[in-house]
Amino acid sequence: MQKIPSFISRFIQDNHVVNFAAYTIDDFWTASCFYAFDHNMARLILLTSKNTRHSQIMLHNPKIVGTISAQITDIQAIKGIQFSATSQLLTKQDTEYHSSLTHYYQRHPFARLTSSDVWLLHLDMIKYTSNEYLFAQKSIWQRHTE
């Protein structure tokens, strides 16, 4: 696995809401969720019920696309990512379940007040755009080089 560049990781870590779309041949839906970023494994951890429309679609097709963007109004401060990922529903029997949930709770302590299903979004490709130093500067990261 390729390491995500630090400037992209920092951007992902500094934000907390992911927007994504799930699809099958018969249905598609979008969702916005709080996330915790697991830099070492290049994945997002999120809590969402497996009974939601987007989760039901992800159970049939784990491939998703999404965005994370800062909510700013100054065009020179625009930063964001577009990504493709593979979703995975964790069960309590999965070895990563408890560590993923702990990681999420560290980022979002209020989530302890309710129970929900734990999902991993394994980032496969990221396109990062920033206007910070150069207008519309783009950087691409891929989990695996071809």
Swiss-Prot record:
It comes from the Bacteria. InterPro entries: Split_barrel_FMN-bd, UPF0306. Belongs to the UPF0306 family. This is UPF0306 protein HD_1359.
